[in-house]
Amino acid sequence: MRAVGVGGSPRADLRHTIDSLTSQPEFRNAHWGVLIVNPRTGDTLYSKNAGKLFMPASNMKIITSAAALALLGPDYTYKTTFLADGPVGDSLLDGNLLVIGRGDPTISDNMRGLATVVMDSLADSVRAHGIRQVSGALARVGNAFPDSTHGYGWEWDDLGEYYGSGVDELIFNEGMAPTTLRPPPDSVRDSLYSGPAKDPGTGYLNAFNDALTRKQILVEAGVMDSILPTPIKMDTLFTYTSPPMRNILPALMKPSQNQIAEILLKTIGLERGGMGTADSARKIVGQQLLSWGVQPDGFIIRDGSGLSRHDLLTPETIVKVLDKMQADTAFAVFYNAMPIAGVDGTLKDRMKGTPAEGNVRAKTGSISAARSLSGYVTTADGERLIFSILANNWSTPSSAVTGVADQIAAALAAYRTH
């Protein structure tokens, strides 16, 4: 449906356009929440169910990313420590090679091009300490993220998918692991697939052990599946520092990467609450939202990514956070991490050929019966607007819901405030 203005003021025409789009007969049973504001003037250009709670899907990542910038900062880095619990001499580490992680999510193909290259560099660092053989095992020490590796309320159907893999203080390739499927005897070759690792921490150690093998370093006892109790004596070999938060957020926001979001949530709990659990983090993020002026009944946080159907946000909450981020010293990091309509990320193929292309910076969201689009748009006369569009529970094809959100965003890009 093409919405047509009624010939009144620009604001009246905009309201008519959005009302027409969201009240089409096919959306008779759908729930829409829309809020559009001009942050410079404080004007509300459009509001529909803006104070109602909706499943936000991946718009929850707006909250997680904003809180991470506010509470951890754009220069925050993750540190992974590599240690020995025995002496090193004559090329032998007479003991275990230990790893203490704190959640570094950056050793992945998505962030580094080829994650094994990073692992090889870590193995080179072990080799630089004169180690060619480890008499014991490769093991992890510490338990920075002691709760479940999956988010609260994640559905069973999601857990076997790439976007539903778990996270831990050690994680390689976003918790994915290669899996070889053996074919029938008459087939030519095996098939190699990638699926969620049963245990992300062990998956990391397996990948690191593979790198050690490539560098001709033998770990005699292999990988220890369980967490090793902290030895009385350990010597630090080296510490690996991740790229900073300013580099991590685009890898989270543009492709809508669930595992990075969950790690950031737990990191907030670890760094600001002393406990790397989702429960600890939810309280801290909630306090941050309240400090920004969000209404206490405007949010329910259950995970960091929005994959949980127990997450609830209002359009008012999202717009408030987007507005507050404009005053943050790291706003450029936040703004540039968002997908750009028609250009990249989850918006690469949307709004092409419209005034929104190359203009709208917004976070998408998509789970069953929930679609969302919230962010920033610059109008035809140069005003930056903030908008949030949430939709839940419809029976029409989901593409129709996404299409309405895109049409609203395009209308905002073409809008003239006066």
Residue ranges and their predicted role:
Residues N29-H31, N49-G51, A57-M60, D75-T77, ...:
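Extracytoplasmic
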Residues M1-P39, Y46-K52, L122-G130:
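Beta-lactamase-like hydrolase cores
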Residues H31-W32, D90-I171, G175, G269-T317:
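Mid-domain, small-residue-enriched loop/turn segments at the edges of structured enzyme/sensor domains
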Residues L14, L45-S47, L265, G269-H418:
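Small-residue-rich helix-loop
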Residues R2-S9, S47-P56, D85, G103-G113, ...:
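Second-shell loop/turn segments in exported
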